[in-house]
Amino acid sequence: MNEKTTSELEHLRGLIDGVDQQLLHLLRKRLDLVAQVGTVKHAAGLPIYAPQREAAMLAKRREEAQTMGIAPQLIEDILRRLMRESYLNEKDVGFKQVKNDLGSVVIVGGKGQLGGLFQQMLRLSGYQVKVLDKDDWQQAECLFADAGLVLVTVPIAITCDIIREKLTQLPRDCILADLTSIKTEPMQAMLAAHKGPVVGFHPMFGPDVGSLAKQVVVVCHGREADKYQWLLEQIAIWGARIVEAEPECHDNAMQLVQAMRHFSTFVYGLNLCKEEADIETLLKFSSPIYRLELAMVGRLFAQSPELYADIIFAQQESQHAIGDYLDNYREALELLKRGDREEFINQFQMVAKWFGDFAPQFQRESRMMLQSVSDMKTN
């Protein structure tokens, strides 16, 4: 570059830096306003996430961006990231306490990651929370004495044993609930162990979420739903969406959503390991979609093997779903071995028809995710 070009670039970059500084000040102002919104919501007991308000605001900003010659998707991307930050800030303000005469909440397994998250959310809502972990059972009678809610969040393999052996003497009006990722057996165990209100939850997210806004919590009703309705309202105030399900229906879905998915991810990682694949080389030649897939595989192996063993081995029925997947894999491999391109296309079209309108919807959603993956690449 010649001296004139260098000078012009430095001048323009200086102007851009100035605009960026203005953006920072505007962001700070917006976050301060969000904090005020959080305070008002806290006082009124309003949910942290208001989907209609969010959708209307995004539609309006997209329309305004179009008028100004700015790509609508650009402003939507920026605003969605801002809203995620806003939900985190609103959470820190705290939440309205729906049930102010509850007594204490006892979290069995509260020193675990998910137990810790619910401990934080309940305390932000003004509840007195006590933790009972594996070394605290000698204090159990004292801890349970004034309990209005006992929340079980222990490894799946010992959940039912803990319920049957340790939770049979709770106060009659105490709510017994669990956060286990399977529901049929824990629900049966809770209903047998406790004569009072019983409800089962499955949070469809990990403990590393910064906010419950837009997250899903599955609820399986057990007994005396009117006694724990306040708890559903409290979870909704945290921003989560409540999805009701029968335990058996939930567990059947989890065979595909969790057990088979995690198992196939495990096998894919195992195959990469046994093939002695060089991850740096794979990343160097990866497309955004493969980088995302590899990230999801790596994410699994960054977490607790005991947790995923619990999920995969929890249901005997999962073996059937995984076995069906393996059979379909073998059949598809036979197509490849035979060189039957025509039948491959026929089956591809059959699956595309089965997906229906979801296929283009998922294509749009994944396009945005892949663009985000590309943005994060540094080399």
Swiss-Prot record:
A Pfam match: PDH_C
Protein name, UniProt field: T-protein
Alphabetical list of PANTHER family matching this protein: PREPHENATE DEHYDROGENASE (PTHR21363), PREPHENATE DEHYDROGENASE [NADP(+)] (PTHR21363:SF0)
Start and end residues of each Prephenate/arogenate dehydrogenase domain: 103-366
SUPFAM superfamilies per record: 6-phosphogluconate dehydrogenase C-terminal domain-like (SSF48179), Chorismate mutase II (SSF48600), NAD(P)-binding Rossmann-fold domains (SSF51735)
GO biological process: chorismate metabolic process; tyrosine biosynthetic process
One GO cellular component, as annotated: cytoplasm
Location relative to the cell: Cytoplasm
Recorded catalytic activity of this chain's protein: chorismate = prephenate; prephenate + NAD(+) = 3-(4-hydroxyphenyl)pyruvate + CO2 + NADH
